[in-house]
């Protein structure tokens, strides 16, 4: 039997690691969830994701409710109060239970002497909630985004920035990709219906299904057998542009965790696929995905800037470059991105993308197709990146996606319920 743990203190410590130490929630949360019961896993996730989604609001409230911020060894208490405020504002947990569990969290983090302080701050919020929220809703903090990102979105999308941030602040839907080598989408939807769940097909992407209500993967029909994979609809759109064919040599660059590698093999089972990623740890997930779906690909660790080190002089019929990016299109799915990214990261990422594009282009056969994709919404990483590449690369031609002046196709977060995503299809003359 698993030890009873205080979920509020665990969530507070996880959020502190993200905000103060720059760690990714996707790395921190899974090992924490292993320590709690199945019924508590979802609540722990809700508390972590929810606090990070609304962090600027919770921070603003604490600054109003407390004369001095908690610092040093007491900093975790700041995040514990955030967890308490989040429960009072956004969950159906009865207020008395939210308060009691949060106050008890002080014992779990070895700060029992601060139980009275935590209780006092949360009760003060309850008394002043109406006037505090009215003041908050008139402040810039109401957008729940860091100021540098807000400015970039306002500049890039003067008409749409508000709808982008609204989408970023929502909970994401759960999209699946039906493995067409096992089932048609309709036949798998029938299995889903038999299992007592409901799904909706995407209008444009033939394998995509949106669940009416997100569910654990182990309850999905045939998940362990490889019949279905979790993948956002916008990410599935890459295959429409890549259009892989049997017998071709195809490179999936920056491939981890392998969702697009396996999608290529579902569409073209006899393609010769090479999947490359710089992160050896994340490559283990590519192997896991290939194994679950019963597929084979050549998997290599390598830096996209130096392809000769891992593929020699080899050339490919098609290349999918899912470039390293700011991930500003998937904030609703990974709210920690708002607090992990810095303004200075954007030019650095744009430079890295440029170097990878220039390095990999010679490894595309004449007449071959390269899909440049990111999960960003920032022009510096997307349309401006491709525009500059076309200007300096004589044998590169834009195909089907935009114009030379405004190259690529930009999906914004929430459009057709998908993530923010960018694609550009390039052909080598």
UniProtKB/Swiss-Prot annotation:
CC annotations in GO: cytosol
Top-rank lineage group of the source organism: Bacteria
Keywords associated with the record: Cytoplasm, Methyltransferase, RNA-binding, rRNA processing, S-adenosyl-L-methionine, Transferase
Localisation: Cytoplasm
EC number: 2.1.1.176
Chief location of this protein within or outside the cell: cytoplasm
Cross-referenced Gene3D superfamilies: Helix hairpin bin (1.10.287.730), NusB-like (1.10.940.10), Sun protein, domain 3 (3.30.70.1170), Vaccinia Virus protein VP39 (3.40.50.150)
Enzyme class name: transferase
Alphabetical list of Pfam families matching this protein: Methyltr_RsmB-F, NusB, RsmF-B_ferredox
Molecular functions (GO terms): RNA binding; rRNA (cytosine-C5-)-methyltransferase activity
Residues annotated to bind S-adenosyl-L-methionine: 254-260, 277, 303, 322
Reactions this protein catalyses: cytidine(967) in 16S rRNA + S-adenosyl-L-methionine = 5-methylcytidine(967) in 16S rRNA + S-adenosyl-L-homocysteine + H(+)
GO BP annotation list: regulation of DNA-templated transcription; rRNA base methylation
Active-site residues, as the UniProt record annotates them: 375 (nucleophile)
SUPFAM superfamilies: NusB-like (SSF48013), S-adenosyl-L-methionine-dependent methyltransferases (SSF53335)
Family annotation (HAMAP family): 16SrRNA_methyltr_B
Family to which the UniProt record says this protein belongs: Belongs to the class I-like SAM-binding methyltransferase superfamily. RsmB/NOP family.
Task performed by this protein: Specifically methylates the cytosine at position 967 (m5C967) of 16S rRNA.
Protein name listed in UniProt: Ribosomal RNA small subunit methyltransferase B
Protein's organism: Escherichia fergusonii (strain ATCC 35469 / DSM 13698 / CCUG 18766 / IAM 14443 / JCM 21226 / LMG 7866 / NBRC 102419 / NCTC 12128 / CDC 0568-73)
